[in-house]
Protein backbone atom coordinates (compact mmCIF):
# COMPACT_ATOMS: atom_id res chain seq x y z
CA UNK A 1 0.00 0.00 0.00
CA UNK A 2 1.35 3.42 -1.01
CA UNK A 3 0.87 5.96 1.81
CA UNK A 4 0.73 9.74 1.38
CA UNK A 5 0.87 12.49 4.00
CA UNK A 6 0.08 16.20 3.89
CA UNK A 7 0.00 18.95 6.51
CA UNK A 8 -2.06 22.07 7.11
CA UNK A 9 -4.41 23.99 9.33
CA UNK A 10 -7.46 23.28 7.14
CA UNK A 11 -9.53 26.03 8.77
CA UNK A 12 -12.63 27.32 6.97
CA UNK A 13 -12.48 24.33 4.64
CA UNK A 14 -13.05 25.29 0.99
CA UNK A 15 -12.90 23.75 -2.47
CA UNK A 16 -9.17 24.51 -2.78
CA UNK A 17 -8.55 22.28 0.24
CA UNK A 18 -10.74 19.56 -1.29
CA UNK A 19 -8.84 19.71 -4.60
CA UNK A 20 -5.51 19.42 -2.71
CA UNK A 21 -6.77 16.40 -0.77
CA UNK A 22 -8.14 14.79 -3.94
CA UNK A 23 -4.83 15.25 -5.80
CA UNK A 24 -2.82 14.03 -2.79
CA UNK A 25 -4.96 10.88 -2.57
CA UNK A 26 -4.38 10.21 -6.28
CA UNK A 27 -0.66 9.81 -5.49
CA UNK A 28 -1.28 6.74 -3.34
CA UNK A 29 -3.74 4.38 -1.69
CA UNK A 30 -3.96 5.86 1.82
CA UNK A 31 -3.94 9.55 2.79
CA UNK A 32 -2.85 10.77 6.21
CA UNK A 33 -3.64 14.43 6.95
CA UNK A 34 -1.78 16.12 9.80
CA UNK A 35 -3.60 19.22 11.04
CA UNK A 36 -2.14 21.91 13.26
CA UNK A 37 -3.25 21.69 16.88
CA UNK A 38 -4.60 24.78 18.61
CA UNK A 39 -1.37 24.97 20.64
CA UNK A 40 0.81 24.79 17.51
CA UNK A 41 -1.28 27.51 15.86
CA UNK A 42 -0.62 29.71 18.91
CA UNK A 43 3.13 29.08 18.55
CA UNK A 44 2.88 30.09 14.88
CA UNK A 45 0.77 33.12 15.86
CA UNK A 46 -1.92 31.82 13.54
CA UNK A 47 -5.58 32.17 14.51
CA UNK A 48 -7.97 29.45 13.42
CA UNK A 49 -11.73 29.93 13.52
CA UNK A 50 -12.45 26.25 14.21
CA UNK A 51 -10.82 24.31 17.05
CA UNK A 52 -8.51 21.38 16.32
CA UNK A 53 -11.23 18.89 17.32
CA UNK A 54 -13.78 20.49 14.98
CA UNK A 55 -11.31 20.65 12.06
CA UNK A 56 -10.41 17.00 12.69
CA UNK A 57 -14.10 16.02 12.69
CA UNK A 58 -14.68 17.85 9.39
CA UNK A 59 -11.64 16.28 7.69
CA UNK A 60 -12.57 12.78 8.85
CA UNK A 61 -15.79 13.02 6.81
CA UNK A 62 -13.98 13.71 3.53
CA UNK A 63 -13.78 10.63 1.31
CA UNK A 64 -10.16 11.23 0.26
CA UNK A 65 -8.91 11.27 3.87
CA UNK A 66 -8.11 7.96 5.54
CA UNK A 67 -6.56 9.20 8.78
CA UNK A 68 -6.17 12.52 10.62
CA UNK A 69 -3.30 13.09 13.05
CA UNK A 70 -2.20 16.15 15.05
CA UNK A 71 0.62 18.40 13.89
CA UNK A 72 2.16 19.60 17.16
CA UNK A 73 5.42 21.15 15.92
CA UNK A 74 7.58 21.79 12.85
CA UNK A 75 10.06 19.03 13.72
CA UNK A 76 7.72 16.01 13.77
CA UNK A 77 7.60 15.41 10.02
CA UNK A 78 10.58 13.03 9.85
CA UNK A 79 9.16 10.93 12.68
CA UNK A 80 5.67 10.95 11.14
CA UNK A 81 7.14 9.53 7.91
CA UNK A 82 8.70 6.68 9.89
CA UNK A 83 5.74 6.06 12.24
CA UNK A 84 3.16 5.99 9.43
CA UNK A 85 5.33 4.26 6.76
CA UNK A 86 4.90 7.20 4.38
CA UNK A 87 5.93 6.91 0.72
CA UNK A 88 4.91 10.38 -0.52
CA UNK A 89 5.03 13.73 1.32
CA UNK A 90 2.73 16.33 -0.28
CA UNK A 91 2.45 20.09 0.23
CA UNK A 92 1.14 23.03 -1.75
CA UNK A 93 3.65 24.72 -4.04
CA UNK A 94 3.69 27.77 -1.75
CA UNK A 95 6.07 25.56 0.31
CA UNK A 96 8.25 24.67 -2.73
CA UNK A 97 11.73 23.53 -1.63
CA UNK A 98 11.05 23.86 2.11
CA UNK A 99 10.74 20.11 2.64
CA UNK A 100 13.35 18.83 0.20
CA UNK A 101 15.36 17.63 3.22
CA UNK A 102 12.80 14.79 3.48
CA UNK A 103 13.70 13.39 0.03
CA UNK A 104 16.07 10.86 1.61
CA UNK A 105 13.05 9.33 3.41
CA UNK A 106 10.28 9.52 0.81
CA UNK A 107 9.14 11.19 -2.39
CA UNK A 108 8.37 14.91 -1.90
CA UNK A 109 5.70 16.48 -4.12
CA UNK A 110 4.60 20.14 -4.26
CA UNK A 111 1.15 20.51 -5.80
CA UNK A 112 -0.02 23.77 -7.43
CA UNK A 113 -2.44 25.80 -5.33
CA UNK A 114 -6.00 26.15 -6.60
CA UNK A 115 -6.31 29.61 -8.14
CA UNK A 116 -8.84 32.09 -6.81
CA UNK A 117 -9.43 30.63 -3.34
CA UNK A 118 -7.68 30.71 0.04
CA UNK A 119 -8.68 30.84 3.68
CA UNK A 120 -7.04 34.27 3.93
CA UNK A 121 -9.12 35.53 1.00
CA UNK A 122 -12.32 34.20 2.61
CA UNK A 123 -11.48 35.89 5.94
CA UNK A 124 -10.71 39.19 4.18
CA UNK A 125 -13.96 39.08 2.20
CA UNK A 126 -16.03 38.28 5.29
CA UNK A 127 -14.33 41.11 7.22
CA UNK A 128 -15.28 43.48 4.40
CA UNK A 129 -19.01 42.71 4.61
From Swiss-Prot:
Main function: Catalyzes the transfer of the cytidylyl group of CTP to sn-glycerol 3-phosphate so the activated glycerol 3-phosphate can be used for teichoic acid synthesis, via incorporation into both the linkage unit and the teichoic acid polymer by TagB and TagF.
UniProt-reported outcome of changing residue 44 to A: Reduces affinity for glycerol 3-phosphate about 100-fold
Subunit structure: Homodimer.
Modulation of this protein's activity: Inhibited by the divalent cations cadmium, mercury, tin, copper and zinc.
Top-level enzyme category: transferase
Residues annotated for CTP binding in this entry: 9-10, 14-17, 46, 113-120
Example of a GO biological process term: teichoic acid biosynthetic process
The protein's name: Glycerol-3-phosphate cytidylyltransferase
Enzyme Commission code: 2.7.7.39
Induction: Positively regulated by WalR. Mainly expressed during exponential growth and rapidly shut off as cells enter the stationary phase.
UniProt catalytic activity: sn-glycerol 3-phosphate + CTP + H(+) = CDP-glycerol + diphosphate
Substitution effect: residue 55 to A: 0.25% of wild-type activity
Effect annotated for changing residue 17 to A: Complete loss of activity
Phenotypic consequence of residue 66 to E: 16% of wild-type activity
Phenotype for residue 38 to A: 8% of wild-type activity, but 7-fold decrease in substrate affinity
Keyword terms: Cell wall biogenesis/degradation, Cytoplasm, Nucleotidyltransferase, Teichoic acid biosynthesis, Transferase
Outcome reported for the amino acid change (mutating residue 46 to A): Reduces affinity for glycerol 3-phosphate about 100-fold
Residue sites binding substrate per the record: 44, 77
GO MF entries: glycerol-3-phosphate cytidylyltransferase activity; metal ion binding
Gene3D superfamilies: HUPs
Listed result of changing residue 55 to K: 23% of wild-type activity
